[in-house]
């Protein structure tokens, strides 16, 4: 029975107070909504769930485990712990961990969940803001953190979305000197950012003489879920920011590069076969990371247009990190009318819905009609997925 169906059965649960009933529905809905997202928690019978928004905003188990694979040490703190998904999996890599959260209800839920399930018996719950927690640290203890993790809230006081790091809460740009002062010599800062934030601008805002940043653009099944910044201490100001674009559905195809490599990359010139050749679209992580030219160079592809992030080759490139089609033909509006096909538009004058309507296309099948610009000219391809 779904939570919506259950909500209509209030009369059968008269023994529950209104508060108990709301809590009961919250638990049913939380388990229902996160069963696939958080399978480890779903398998624990007495696991508690927070309100819907917290369940929606929390990391998935897959992305949380990936973050945990990047770090290890003696002690860590999660300054914006929320539901505690990242805290749970990150803490497995450390001997001691602090959970910091300003929402009292989330702290209550975390205390219950971590009390009997966490692998780390040294995890402590702190009901506090990030700023107050940091202010409470002092002496050698205050300089003993091997990891400071934060996922700054990306909404203002009125609930509106913000897109600059300095407008998020806590303001990690302002807090950066304080964060650095609490790290061990090999300690690191990890920030989880929105996919909507400008990566280059975020790194620039967090620039400091003593540290460099590694960037991780993390996608799952071609949807970017989060952008991670992980600090590394360095006095070499010439050291470049490395960027890893990874889709956790195909982690072996991770694409690692620097902005300088992309900037200095020259595109391949030539005349690839557009009929019978192969068409490529990099995965969402690579596109978000901005490796538009470098992906062409590394895989020996030709880019269709400076502003069209589609690529072609005469022969099939194996293990390409993204989608691949075989081009059956270029086609005109008249050629494509009335058939059944999936529609994709990239740098094309019409949206997929507009093109579909114009062509009188029915959804489905294995064929694709792909609209894009080739050397500035709107072009249609009729293709099949490889």
Identify what each model region corresponds to.
Residues 1-386:
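SAM-dependent transferase fold signal centered on methyltransferase-like domains
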């Amino acid at each position: 029975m779904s939570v919506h169906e259950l909500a209509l059965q209030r009369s059968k649960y008269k023994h529950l107070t209104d508060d108990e009933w709301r809590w009961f529905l919250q638990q049913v809905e939380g388990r229902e909504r996160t069963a696939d997202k958080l399978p480890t928690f779903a398998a624990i019978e007495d696991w508690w769930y927070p309100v819907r928004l917290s369940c929606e905003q929390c990391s998935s188990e897959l992305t949380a485990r990936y973050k945990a694979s990047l770090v290890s040490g003696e002690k860590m703190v999660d300054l914006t712990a929320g539901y505690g998904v990242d805290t749970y999996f990150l803490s497995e890599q450390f001997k001691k961990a602090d959970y910091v959260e300003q929402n009292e209800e989330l702290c209550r839920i975390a205390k219950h969940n971590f009390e009997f399930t966490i692998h780390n018996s040294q995890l402590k719950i702190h009901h506090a803001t990030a700023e107050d927690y940091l202010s409470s640290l002092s002496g050698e203890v205050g300089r003993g953190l091997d990891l400071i993790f934060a996922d700054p809230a990306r909404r203002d006081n009125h609930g509106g979305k913000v897109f600059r790091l300095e407008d998020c809460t806590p303001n990690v740009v302002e807090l950066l000197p304080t964060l650095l002062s609490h790290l061990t010599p090999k300690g690191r800062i990890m920030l989880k950012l929105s996919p909507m934030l400008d990566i280059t601008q975020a790194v620039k805002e967090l620039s400091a003489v003593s540290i460099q940043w590694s960037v991780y653009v993390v996608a799952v099944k071609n949807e970017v879920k989060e952008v991670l910044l992980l600090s590394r201490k360095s006095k070499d100001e010439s050291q470049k920011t490395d960027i890893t674009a990874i889709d956790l559905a195909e982690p072996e195809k991770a694409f690692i590069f620097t902005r300088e490599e992309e900037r200095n990359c020259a595109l391949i010139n030539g005349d690839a076969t557009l009929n019978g050749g192969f068409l490529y679209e990099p995965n969402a992580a690579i596109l978000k990371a901005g490796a538009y030219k470098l992906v062409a160079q590394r895989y020996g592809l030709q880019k269709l247009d400076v502003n069209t992030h589609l690529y072609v080759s005469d022969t099939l490139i194996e293990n390409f990190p993204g989608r691949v089609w075989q081009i059956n033909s270029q086609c005109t509006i008249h050629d494509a009318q009335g058939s059944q096909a999936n529609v994709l538009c990239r740098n094309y004058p019409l949206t997929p819905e507009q093109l579909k309507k114009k062509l009188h296309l029915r959804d489905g099948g294995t064929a694709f009609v792909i609209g894009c610009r080739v050397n500035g000219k709107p072009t249609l391809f009729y293709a099949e997925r490889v």
